[in-house]
């Protein structure tokens, strides 16, 4: 069984991005209308997105925010491009809180922890933990996040300044809600939301990156 958090193996990752960094302008998508569900999302130039494909549930499109959390975004993008998220799962699900996943399917993979980009750790991060925000999961150690992330299915302000939000859902909150409803039927312990039967954990088929940022190196 996967542990709640992947093994911490090294010092925090320092990222030097060659892309221009811009903050996110917008708000999380709260409701998919029936008319919009089947239409492709219009990706904007200058922004970077992640498409989380969840088997039997659908796709969650997330706009990433390198201007607010550059280290978290670049780490997430790198891991996605390496295929680390293929066949990972959402293993912890709580209604009125979040869905958590992203531990590598291969337990032998060792990942480098990154700096926690949040106020309590000395970083300015303007992303609040409202419904639709994606954020890095971690242990009680500030600089311990690796691959695991969570998506808020409700506003959760007590996390503000304590965890590194790095993007928000722009399409697919209906998928997040469906995963939440399903997960609450299979959690072994309502208190922590863990789904201990791995065969019942929703599977992340893959996470693909749509990077429309303009390189500053011309």
Give the role of each language-model region.
Residues 3-26:
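Sec-dependent N-terminal signal peptides of Gram-positive bacterial secreted proteins and lipoproteins
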Residues 22-218:
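Cyclophilin-like peptidyl-prolyl cis-trans isomerases
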């Amino acid at each position: 069984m996967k542990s709640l958090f992947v093994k911490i193996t090294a010092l925090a990752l320092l990222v030097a991005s060659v892309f221009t960094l811009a903050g996110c302008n917008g708000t999380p998508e709260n409701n998919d209308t029936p008319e919009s569900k089947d239409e492709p999302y219009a990706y904007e130039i200058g922004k970077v997105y992640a498409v989380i494909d969840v088997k039997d549930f659908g796709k969650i499109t997330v706009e990433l925010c390198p201007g607010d959390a550059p280290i978290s975004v670049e780490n997430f993008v790198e891991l996605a491009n390496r295929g680390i998220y293929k066949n990972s799962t959402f293993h912890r699900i709580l209604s009125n809180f979040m869905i958590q996943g992203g531990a590598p399917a291969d337990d032998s993979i060792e990942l480098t922890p990154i700096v926690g980009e949040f106020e309590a750790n000395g970083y300015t991060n303007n992303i609040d933990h409202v419904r639709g925000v994606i954020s890095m999961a971690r242990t009680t150690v500030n600089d311990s996040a690796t691959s695991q992330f969570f998506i808020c299915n409700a506003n959760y302000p007590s996390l503000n300044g304590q965890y590194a939000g790095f993007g928000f859902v722009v399409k697919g909150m209906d998928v997040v809600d469906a995963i939440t409803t399903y997960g609450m039927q299979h959690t072994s312990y309502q208190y922590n939301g863990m789904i201990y039967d791995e065969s019942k954990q929703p599977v992340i088929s893959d996470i693909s990156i749509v990077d429309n940022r303009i390189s500053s190196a011309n």
